Amino acid sequence: MAEHVRVKGRIIVGLTENIKLISSEGLNEEVVAKVDTGATKSSIDTRLAKKLKLGPVIKSKMIKSAHGNQLRPIIEAEILLAGKKIKTEFSLADRNHMKYKMLIGVNILKEGFLVDPAKK
């Protein structure tokens, strides 16, 4: 993984980042995630979550998306982003038709990250 620069204690990330999903089953997987400052909650593809045996579903929540409002299952999962381990909530969504199987939202970014769109 590339070296991440810090500014005033915050880690600089780009519009896409390599993420390691950490499964309690030991089925960890690295994926490229899209960073989305307009998304309140992070999201994982339903099939990827099932493959890694992530879960259980802790609640359901109404999520606003480009496709309108959707009631989505919410799980708690752990990731490694830029060397920082974070455990937080993710909504499950069908992202199979999308380029990125994971979306990093504000709930993760507020854990000490800044987004630089020019960062490669």
Per-region residue spans from a language model:
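Pepsin/retropepsin-fold aspartyl endopeptidases
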Residues: M1-K120
